[in-house]
Amino acid sequence: MTLVGNFSPLVLVGDSDRVEAETVGAYLDGWAGHDKVRLATANAIKAILSGAGRLVGRIARGYLPGDPGKLVGVNSDQDQQKSIDVGSHNLFVELLIAAGVASILSEEADLPVAGKADGLVAVAIDPLDGSGNVGLGAPLGTIFSIFPADVEEPFLQPGNRQIAAGYVSYGNSVDLGFSVGEGVIFATLDPVSGQFHITRRNVKLPERTSDLAFNASVQRHLSAGMQAYVNDAFLGKDGPRGRNFNMRWLGAAVGDMHRIMQRGGLFFYVNDSRPGYEKGRLRLVYEANPIAFLAREAGSKATDGSRPILDIVPQTYHERSALVFGVAEEVDILGEYFVK
């Protein structure tokens, strides 16, 4: 018996059978105009979206063609690499080189990959954030940052020199959040047309939140100040904060970012006493920087606990950093505890 057939998709009340919202490609074309750096930026983003469309097709097939989570090596920091990590890296590098970028820094390669000698932009990318969730139906994503390639080391510039940044969240829909410095825009992939269509513009975070995203299992390893922050929040309305807090933790920075950008919240992944976590765990150049760029464009903040992420000058390509981002008021409150 055939359980699944070639059926038309479910249509809900109020649904339209046509997607008429502007495509991201059309938006980027209008934004870029005839400016050479903007055109290079637009082409890089289009290449990433093309790769995302191809990658999600493989993600959706799960274990059918083979094990996407098969271990095949280690990256520069000795993190285990899965088959899908390497495949997604190769995919995005190929597309970005074809798009004419000057160089690509990927989590899955020790050194930047050279592109077009006279390219105007450089792209830092984590091809598949949260790959530990592969095959589990949990969040996965791609996150990227675009810098001007007008200096010898484009990836060792502070984040405030970013031209654009964004992420693609592979969930029950394929969603894009990005900014070219003119506010945060959301878009969703239409699987019929293969195009990302804009769904929201000028996204802003709320002024207050009671949602926290962090790994509670490591609380005992946090500094005294950070433990006090967590304890005070968990005391709820009977504690010094005077209100109850909820906890959300998706185990992938892109997943938590996407939720917070829509619902508000505070994410933190800071340094702690465990070996290898003394400086935090997320990568500054291609994780913390794009998140901080989007946070700023959404009227919120991102710090390493005390310093704005966008002001930090990286010393190495794969430098790690503590990261706190989300609703500005809560970032400031956490910062007061962080320095205790």
Curated annotation (Swiss-Prot):
Its cofactor is Mg(2+). One of its GO terms (biological process) is fructose 1,6-bisphosphate metabolic process. Pathway: Carbohydrate biosynthesis; gluconeogenesis. This is Fructose-1,6-bisphosphatase class 1. It is found in: Cytoplasm. Mg(2+) 2 binds at D126, D129, E287. Pfam families: FBPase, FBPase_C. It catalyses: beta-D-fructose 1,6-bisphosphate + H2O = beta-D-fructose 6-phosphate + phosphate. Its main location: cytoplasm. Belongs to the FBPase class 1 family. Homotetramer. Mg(2+) 1 binds at E107, D126, L128. GO terms for cellular component: cytosol. Keywords: Carbohydrate metabolism, Cytoplasm, Hydrolase, Magnesium, Metal-binding. GO terms for molecular function: fructose 1,6-bisphosphate 1-phosphatase activity; magnesium ion binding. Its EC number is 3.1.3.11. Substrate binds at N215. InterPro entries: FBPase_C_dom, FBPase_class-1, FBPase_N, FBPtase, Fructose_bisphosphatase_AS. It comes from the Bacteria. PROSITE patterns: FBPASE. Binds 2 magnesium ions per subunit.
